[in-house]
Swiss-Prot record:
Assembly with partners or alone: The potassium channel is probably composed of a homo- or heterotetrameric complex of pore-forming subunits.
SMART domains with a match to the protein in the record: ANK, cNMP
GO CC annotation, single: monoatomic ion channel complex
Protein name per Swiss-Prot or TrEMBL: Potassium channel SKOR
Length: 828
């Protein structure tokens, strides 16, 4: 692999390869290797969050952070000023972790300078306690950031709040105030818990790839060893101070004599000498070398020495094991040698050529030297990050593919993140004519040929595929065998997409699937191979539209509004019908889904569309007792529009379905509709003796005097039935209807039923979006009364006339048909 002028990827010398760069790229067909190297200390500086040289808008100040706290805002743990604060507290935690054992062992009451420093440290930790109540945290189960104040406080109170608060207590002052009781000094050891902050810091450093791992681990192990021996040294000295001065000879340090130097009256010796001697005792005891110059004297010292040495056995195993794992890494070289030996045996057994041998060995050596393989690097990376990598690498190529011209960015992104990169040498056949295709390919670099095999077996070059072309799409989309053989002419870099992944994406992005098929058809004039397959593509388009209509109806039937919206946004036509002529509005109305009905109305569907059985959505809603849905449809101008309404209504009455009849009458069906025998629904109700249904029909202005084919009226049918209540009802209705007409008229006309109309205050030419909401009214006896009522209901006192949908002025109510849309206007 060649390097660029800017420098290549650098590695450590020796058997081990350790990449020192923060970012690097390896690119065969790109511009080379790009590398950006800065100061060797920059990664550590960035890790500590101490790079404050930002722009003017994002400049860090602690004052700004304190202002955020004062306003009650929640601080993100990655906030730059909070990171700086954690580094500040880390320094205090490191100081406190080492000074606390020292204070416990060597001091009984701090001198003034150390006392002031101790108080300053405790104040800093108190501020940190308050700040912790304002810092968001990541939930361990959901991995979401929690910003709720009560949750943050409750979590902290349940965890380390008590320990942190007790650690901040001024135990030196309390010790003196309590009469220098030794038991109080033991509470000082609570501050040792602060060492967990240092441990967490090392954990973060180990996970930061910008900082050398070997260096981090060695520093951590040295810290562990020093801290353990430091603490043990302080405890050894503390045990010696627990005996009175008169018994100093019974302590390890009071009885100690090194050469001519005696440690009698050791309390008067300077602090540095005492600490160094204690540290020496702790280190040699931990190392178990046992020189014998310092040893335990009294029983308490012996017991602690035994416990300490037992602990040192575990600590020593931990330190040695970690150091061995860090230093001994010959296994990597051994794995490379074993793998190379296996490859050589394989190549010899299969007698591979020199060219392919060189490629294989070169690839393995590159893997070893660079510690890089694409699959190994990406397999542990989250899918979202792998998707971003794929978009960076492949999106520029896929956007130029003519097959995806006009497709949505979301669809293209889904294609990109599922691509696999492959390379092919000249002469290789990728697809054979007549084979079943399971992959879709896109050309990034190189040249391929589409070859057709004629009847006599000769080859004919049909097309030349260059960068930004695709192949395999016709076989996949139309579900036919591969029409041509695809062979590599020049070294090619190709992106592969599995058929199943492609079809899964198309099921979600329907509109883009149709766009792809249209792109194929649009290119048929310039592409002979596609022109020959035009009928297959057209058939597939029709099949796709039928499947989409079924999916829309299925979503409407099951009340899945989200799926319905997704399908319509993806290009589904809500006016398309299934094999029975039923639209999504039919199914939503029949199931009583108000939300879906309202959404479909907003999508400007035809509210009066009929299925193959002649049913409208309004009729479906009424059949199933969905009155609220029916009201929505009526408000939008929906009508029953039933063919052979008389026969239909007579059938309903014959079944005795009073609820259904009531809903039909309230939604504008003509109660005087007649069947093939000129019988009205009232004829059927009277003949069957349905008193309740007869009342409903009479109240809906059914004509009592209407005659059937044989000249019988409903009253005649009731007399034949013999139902006295029904006879009286019809006689009263007859007298009422006769009296409501002039004396010269013997019978009222047929169809003296009420008519409804929908009145809008807008111009008939306005679109549905601009039209104001109208009102449904019964048609009164005069046009003046209709205008007056509409003006009052719509609150437009200036209106003076009514227009039809054709912008014609209506001057008589007899000209208004049932369910007609009218427009209230100002006459000029």
């Amino acid at each position: 692999m060649g390097g660029s002028s800017g420098g290549g990827v650098s590695y450590r010398s020796g058997g081990e390869s350790d990449v020192e760069l923060e970012d690097y790229e390896v690119d065969d067909f790109r511009d080379g290797i790009v590398e950006s190297r800065g100061n060797r200390f920059n990664p550590l500086t960035n890790f500590l969050g101490l790079d404050f040289a930002g722009g003017s808008g994002g400049k860090f100040t602690v004052i700004n952070g304190i202002r955020d706290i004062s306003r009650g805002s929640i601080v993100h743990p990655d906030n730059r000023w909070y990171k700086a604060w954690t580094m500040f507290i880390l320094i205090w935690a490191l100081y406190s972790s080492f000074f606390t054992p020292l204070e416990f062992g060597f001091f009984r009451g701090l001198p003034e300078n150390l006392f002031i420093l101790d108080i300053a440290g405790q104040i800093a930790f108190l501020v940190d306690i308050v700040l912790t109540f304002f810092v968001a945290y990541r939930d361990s189960r959901t991995y979401r950031m929690i910003y709720k104040r009560s949750s943050i406080a409750l979590r902290y109170l349940k965890s380390t709040f008590i320990i942190d608060l007790l650690a901040c207590m001024p135990w030196d002052i309390i010790y003196k105030a309590a009469g220098e009781k030794e038991e109080v000094r033991y509470l000082l050891l609570i501050r040792l818990y602060r060492v967990h902050r240092v441990i967490l810091f090392f954990h973060k450093m180990e996970k930061d790839i910008r900082i050398n791992y070997l260096f981090t681990r060695i520093v951590k192990l040295i810290f562990v060893e020093l801290y353990c021996t430091h603490t043990a040294a302080c405890i050894f000295y503390y045990l010696a101070t627990t005996l009175p001065a008169s018994q100093e000879g019974y302590t390890w340090i009071g009885s100690l004599k090194l050469g001519d130097y005696s440690y009698s009256k050791f309390r008067e010796i300077d602090l540095w000498t005492r600490y160094t001697t204690s540290m020496y005792f702790a280190v040699v005891t931990m190392a178990t070398v046992g020189y014998g110059d310092i040893h335990a004297v009294n029983m308490r010292e012996m017991i602690f020495a035994m416990v300490y040495i037992s602990f040192d056995m575990i600590l020593g195993a931990y330190l040695i094991g970690n150091m061995t794992a860090l230093i001994v890494k010959g296994s990597k070289t051994e794995r490379f040698r074993d793998k190379m030996a296996d490859i050589m045996r394989y190549m010899n057994r299969n007698k591979l050529g020199r060219n392919i041998r060189g490629q294989i060995t070169g690839h393995l050596r590159l893997q070893y030297e660079s510690s890089y393989t694409e699959a190994a690097v990406l397999q542990d990376i989250p899918v979202s990050i792998r998707a971003k990598i794929a978009q960076t690498l492949y999106l520029p190529y896929i956007e130029k593919v003519p097959l995806f011209r006009g497709c949505s960015s979301e669809f293209i992104n889904q294609i990109v993140i599922r691509l696999h990169e492959e390379f092919f040498l000249p002469g290789e056949v990728i697809m054979e004519q007549g084979s079943v295709v399971d992959q879709l390919y896109f050309v990034c670099h190189g040249v391929l040929e589409e070859i057709g095999i004629t009847k006599d077996g000769s080859e004919e070059i049909v097309a030349v595929l260059q960068p930004d072309h695709s192949f395999g799409e016709i076989s996949i989309l139309c579900n036919i065998p591969q029409p041509y053989t695809v062979r590599v002419a020049e070294l090619c870099r190709i992106l592969r997409l599995d058929k199943q992944s492609f079809m899964n994406i198309l099921e979600i992005f329907f509109h883009d699937g149709r766009r792809i098929l249209n792109n194929l058809l649009e290119g048929k004039e310039s592409n002979v191979r596609i022109k020959q397959l035009e009928s297959d593509i057209t058939f597939h388009i029709s099949k796709q539209e039928a499947e989409l209509a079924l999916k829309l109806n299925s979503a409407a039937f099951y009340g899945d509004l989200y799926q319905l919206k997704s399908l319509i946004r993806a290009g589904g036509d809500p006016n398309k019908t299934d094999y029975d002529g039923r639209s999504p509005l039919h199914l939503a109305a029949s199931r009583g889904y108000e939300d879906i009905t309202l959404y479909l109305i907003q999508e400007s569907v035809d509210v009066n569309i009929k299925d193959k059985l002649g049913s409208t959505p309004l009729l479906e809603a009424i059949k199933n007792g969905n009155d609220r849905v029916a009201a929505l449809l009526v408000k939008e101008g929906a009508t029953l529009n039933i063919e052979n309404a008389g026969t239909f209504l007579c059938t309903v009455v014959a079944k005795g379905d009073s609820d259904f009849l009531k809903r039909l009458l309230s939604n504008g069906i003509d109660p005087n509709s007649k069947d093939y025998d000129h019988r009205t629904p009232l004829h059927v109700a009277a003949s069957e003796g349905f008193y309740v249904l007869a009342i409903q029909l009479v109240e809906a202005s059914a004509n009592v005097l209407a005659k059937d084919r044989w000249g019988n009226t409903p009253l005649d049918e009731a007399l034949g039935c013999g139902n006295k209540m029904l006879i009286k009802l019809l006689e009263d209705a007859k007298n009422s209807q006769i009296s409501s007409f002039p004396s010269g008229s013997k019978e009222p006309k047929d169809k003296v039923y009420k008519k409804k109309c929908t009145v809008y205050f807008s111009h008939p030419g306005d679109s549905k979006e601009k039209r104001r909401r109208g009102i449904v009214l019964w048609v009164p006896r005069s046009i003046e009364e209709l205008i007056r009522t509409a003006k009052e209901q719509l609150n437009v006192p200036e209106a003076s006339c009514v227009l039809s949908e054709d912008e014609a002025k209506i001057i008589d109510v007899d000209l208004i048909s049932d369910g007609q849309k009218l427009y209230l206007a100002v006459e000029t």
